[in-house]
């Protein structure tokens, strides 16, 4: 039985609970079709917009004395539960409609990072909503946040994004898979924790979900990693007149595109880097990068970027 890790992008899940649920309903059809064809899948997801909104809302309440401030790791855990719940509901309903008897479980997942990771001094991970430059400058002045321009879509707050070292709940994930459970894990890249003297402590950061998904896929010895985002292909010369979507490319070709500066930091670059990390550990595997809405067409080979060694 072929094993696939599917990583859904947080930006591709929409900007509201209703929009997210509607998108997940259609995506669940494609995911369950994989199960129906005999594939074993594990699902991860991003949380950039969602965790930013949760953190912003709770901070607003705290500033207006309507509740306590919440640390970022707790906000990450809330986003895992919120997104995981909607995924579970959509997948359970679709499994039932297909006559497939399978349990779906969301596992709150911690991921270990290094306390001395250089990312803590160089925030790069976009979270939350898109703002105008004027709005971003106002937040920077009032709250000390760092903002960057995000691929022509506006300005977003950025936070540290350390490298994932290990998945704390990996054994539990494997146990659930062994018992035939459809597992949703490592949401938002996992809740970042550091380990000192055998004690885990959460830290203020957001791990790139694609890099954690690549780590998970490698540990599970998956045959394929599917990264779902907001665009149908990986593009070179993105946003220019000579923009071109990549179909099937080799690892060496992708490395050249990276060296040529083709992919934006905090956007497509970490997805491509995650793909290469997985293929370095599983030389016989493959990575498919495509849009959430276009997953069905991508599985039929009509769209998407397929990366192989």
From Swiss-Prot:
It comes from Staphylococcus aureus (strain USA300). It catalyses: hydrogencarbonate + NH4(+) + ATP = carbamoyl phosphate + ADP + H2O + H(+). GO terms for cellular component: cytosol. It holds the Pfam family AA_kinase. Pathway: Metabolic intermediate metabolism; carbamoyl phosphate degradation; CO(2) and NH(3) from carbamoyl phosphate: step 1/1. One of its GO terms (biological process) is arginine deiminase pathway. This is Carbamate kinase 3. Its main location: cytoplasm. NCBIfam families: arcC, PRK12352.1.
């Amino acid at each position: 039985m072929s094993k696939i890790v599917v990583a859904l992008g947080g930006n591709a899940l929409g900007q509201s609970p209703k929009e997210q649920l509607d998108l997940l309903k259609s995506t669940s059809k494609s995911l369950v079709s994989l199960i129906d064809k005999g594939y074993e899948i594990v699902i991860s997801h991003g949380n950039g917009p969602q965790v930013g909104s949760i953190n912003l809302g709770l901070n607003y309440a705290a500033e207006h004395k309507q509740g306590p401030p919440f640390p970022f790791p707790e906000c990450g855990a809330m986003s895992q539960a919120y997104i995981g719940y909607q995924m579970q509901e959509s997948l359970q309903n679709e499994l039932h409609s297909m006559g497939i008897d399978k349990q779906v479980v969301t596992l709150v997942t911690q991921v270990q990072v290094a306390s001395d990771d250089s990312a803590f001094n160089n925030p790069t991970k976009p979270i939350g909503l898109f703002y105008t430059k004027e709005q971003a400058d106002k937040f920077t002045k009032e709250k000390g946040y760092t903002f960057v321009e995000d691929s022509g879509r506006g300005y977003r707050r950025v936070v540290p994004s350390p490298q994932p070292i290990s998945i704390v709940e990996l054994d539990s994930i494997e146990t659930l898979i062994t018992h035939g459970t459809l597992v949703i894990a490592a949401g938002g890249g996992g809740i970042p924790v550091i380990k000192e003297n055998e004690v885990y402590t959460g830290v203020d950061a957001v791990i790139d979900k694609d890099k954690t998904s690549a780590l998970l896929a490698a540990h599970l010895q998956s045959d394929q990693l599917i990264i779902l985002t907001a665009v149908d292909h990986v593009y070179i010369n993105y946003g220019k007149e000579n923009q071109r979507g990549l179909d099937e490319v080799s690892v060496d070709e992708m490395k050249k595109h990276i060296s040529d500066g083709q992919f934006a930091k905090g956007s497509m670059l970490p997805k491509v880097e995650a793909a290469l990390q997985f293929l370095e550990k599983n030389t016989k595997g493959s990575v498919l990068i495509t849009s959430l809405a276009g997953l069905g067409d991508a599985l039929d080979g009509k769209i998407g970027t397929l990366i192989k060694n």
